Amino acid sequence: SAEGVQRGAYVLADLGGGQPEVILMASGSEVSLIVGAGKRLVELGRSVRLVSFPSWELFAEQDQAYQDSVLLPEVRARVAVEAGVSQGWRQ
């Protein structure tokens, strides 16, 4: 969403129904990779949240409530897909 881009990150989709078991995160061209992986995980019976991260810097400026609404704190399993730079993903 346009608002999500302005906030640095947004939920692209929740797949599989119910509480997500894993959060897949990516930016740029890698977003298509997490979409494919998410669909495959749903086929295997998993619930997945897909998050697009256009800007770590903008996301870090958001209030904690927004950050928690995107990166659910109760979901500890998280995978970041990035072909170039690891900056930001360690957070």
Enumerate the language-model features and the residues they cover:
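Thiamine diphosphate
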Residues: 1-91
